[in-house]
Curated annotation (Swiss-Prot):
One of its GO terms (cellular component) is membrane. PANTHER family: BCL-2 RELATED (PTHR11256), INDUCED MYELOID LEUKEMIA CELL DIFFERENTIATION PROTEIN MCL-1 (PTHR11256:SF46). This is Induced myeloid leukemia cell differentiation protein Mcl-1 homolog. The record marks D127, G128, D157, G158 as: Cleavage. Residues 104-175 are annotated as: PEST-like. Residues 148-170 are annotated as: Disordered. Belongs to the Bcl-2 family. Pfam families: Bcl-2. A motif (BH1) lies at residues 252-272.
Length: 350
């Protein structure tokens, strides 16, 4: 096969008016014989009606061969670099691809410079390719990966899921309902007026939970106002950063592993006490972040317990004064332990 390609190159070079190649100059007579045969065959094809041979060898059907072949005519269309929009066309149409059909890895020794340059090395093939930065997700998923995700989804038609799984929906609903109830209660305590606007989502259940929280939370604040004031002075809450630091103290309330509705309602009641303080120092914008911090601590650390107790429905059903007062005493002791009855709590939230 290599011999045929070599003879084709020699014949083309002589036909275009060039000198014989170095490796084939010694066998000029045999090469010349082959050249005459090739020429006769091409002429016969043109006479029969196939102008394709003339177009490939001479440049156009039925036309006389050109005296010389332009150097760029031996060049081929280089493959476009990876990531490029189109091919990097550097020469004439693909009819002059004398070596493309055989896919040789390197040009023959007799090949001249322009034709040899047309064969790309692996380094040239990757020219223009920019490696993707580590940790960056590709903008478009590969087709096979996208099909695999679609086929493994819950839909039978291969479409991607548009809604989260049921467990995730339940978690989101618990957080949403908790945030709505706690945020509404804290704002009402700060302004001193009830909000008549209906609650969204599970309205009836949330409304009952809010009414229960108003009744129980207001009683906790009245009975333990002095203790709440002492804790507020130690916390020294003045801005949103101080409010965010409060979440560490809330987590400590449940550090002994004991959870009950008494501790939860005491924590929310103290949050309402802090909301009143924020209103008095013109920091009402910090009330919503405070409600989010309380909700995050409760739902994130006590989700399993809340689900087992049926969430806010269980809160509405719960009302035992003994258990409530026992939970309140434990919360106050926990705050005192964090504060160290001194500057320990102030140091903790810095």
């Amino acid at each position: 096969m290599f011999g045929l390609k070599r003879n084709a190159v020699i014949g083309l070079n002589l036909y275009c008016g060039g000198a014989g190649l170095a490796a084939g100059s010694g066998g000029a007579s045999s090469s010349g014989g082959r050249l005459v045969a090739v020429g006769k065959e091409a002429t016969a094809r043109r006479e029969v009606g196939g102008g394709e041979a003339g177009a490939v060898i001479g440049g156009s059907a039925g036309a006389s061969p050109p005296a010389t072949l332009a150097p760029d005519a031996r060049r081929v269309a280089r493959p476009s670099p990876i990531g490029a929009e189109g091919p990097d066309v550097t020469a004439t149409p693909p009819k002059l691809l004398f070596f493309a059909a055989t896919r040789c890895a390197s040009p023959p020794e007799e090949m001249e410079g322009p034709a040899a340059d047309a064969i790309m090395s692996p380094e040239e093939e990757l020219d223009g390719y920019e490696p993707e930065p580590l940790g960056k997700r590709p903008a478009v998923l590969p087709l096979l990966e996208l099909v695999g995700e679609a086929s493994s989804g819950p839909g039978t038609d291969g479409s991607l899921p548009s809604t989260p799984p049921p467990a995730e929906e339940e978690e989101d609903e618990l957080f949403r309902q908790s945030l709505e109830i706690i945020s509404r209660y804290l704002r009402e305590q700060a302004t001193g007026a009830k909000d008549a606007k209906p609650l969204g989502g599970s309205g009836a259940a949330s409304r009952k939970a809010l009414e229960t929280l108003r009744r129980v939370g207001d009683g906790v604040q009245r009975n333990h106002e002095t203790a709440f004031q002492g804790m507020l002075r130690k916390l020294d809450i003045k801005n949103e950063n101080d409010v965010k630091s409060l979440s560490r103290v809330m987590v400590h309330v449940f550090s002994d592993g004991v959870t009950n509705w008494g501790r939860i309602v005491t924590l929310i009641s103290f949050g309402a006490f802090v909301a009143k303080h924020l209103k008095s120092i013109n920091q009402e914008s910090c009330i919503e972040p405070l409600a989010e911090s309380i909700t995050d601590v409760l739902v994130r650390t006590k989700r399993d317990w809340l689900v087992k107790q049926r969430g806010w429905d269980g809160f509405v059903e719960f009302f035992h004064v003994e258990d409530l007062e026992g939970g309140i005493r434990n919360v106050l002791l926990a705050f005192a332990g964090v504060a160290g009855v001194g500057a320990g709590l102030a140091y903790l939230i810095r």
